[in-house]
Regions:
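Short glycine-rich substrate-engagement loop in P-loop NTPases that contacts/grips substrate
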Residues: 14-24, 60-101
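Loop/turn-to-beta-strand initiation segments
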Residues: 67-68, 101-105, 133-139
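A short, basic N-terminal segment
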Residues: 1-18, 167, 178-184
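Pre-Walker A (pre-P-loop) alpha-helix and adjacent loop at the N terminus of AAA/AAA+ ATPase modules
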Residues: 6-41
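Generic beta-sheet signal
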Residues: 39-43, 105-107, 137
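Walker A/P-loop nucleotide-binding motif
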Residues: 35-55
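Conserved alpha-helical scaffold flanking the Walker A/P-loop in AAA+ ATPase domains
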Residues: 29-33, 80-105, 120-129, 155
Length: 184
């Protein structure tokens, strides 16, 4: 289970710990103050640095406060949106409504889905719709902002760079560190 309590700062280099401590504290504050004006967040950085862990902790805290939260991987999100659009699958159409309307949406691993013109358009539509309706989104990605612009579009880049609070995760892969220590 991913929580704020088991987010271990010891895996970050001493130079990075104060910054990561602030990221955790800001994330806890985000949960406490979650509401109509909450900002969207963009967690960027290499794999294994805690982006998913921290976004799951935020999602759980916001859900426990009674808000509707959806947590979905980018590949699953795109598969479901495509099913709803092209096969008119009822469950996928309902999924789309929830994704566009939930109080907080967390998209994990943006950039790992098969990127096509369709997925580029869907990412833009989803990001734009949620911004226009004041619905916050947290996006985790291994891509940097320039890679996002190249992969999706300048319109997606502009919205993420200009309207999301970007948080860059740095350090050594925590999963690999844990494996070296004998954790699974």
């Amino acid at each position: 289970e991913c929580s704020f309590e088991n987010f271990e700062l010891r895996y970050y280099d001493e130079r990075l710990r104060p910054t990561m401590r602030k990221v955790v504290e800001s994330s806890q504050r985000y949960v406490r103050e979650f509401g109509g004006q909450s900002q969207s967040l963009l967690f960027t950085g290499a794999p294994g640095l805690g982006k998913t862990h921290l976004s799951l902790a935020i999602a759980e805290g916001v859900a426990k406060a009674g808000h509707l939260v959806m947590y979905v991987s980018a590949p699953h999100l795109m598969d479901q949106l495509e099913l709803g659009k092209f096969q008119k699958d009822d469950a996928a159409l309902e999924f789309r409504e929830v994704i566009f309307g939930c109080d907080l949406l967390v998209i994990d691993d943006l950039g790992t889905e098969l990127v096509t013109r369709y997925t580029q358009a869907e990412v833009y539509d989803l990001v734009n719709h949620r911004l226009n309706t004041g619905k916050p989104t947290i996006i985790n990605t291994n891509l940097g902002l320039q890679e996002i612009e190249r992969t999706y579009s300048s319109r997606v880049y502009s919205r993420l760079a200009g309207m999301y609070a970007a948080v860059q995760f740095k350090g050594r892969d925590i999963r690999l560190q844990k494996k070296q220590e004998g954790y699974r």
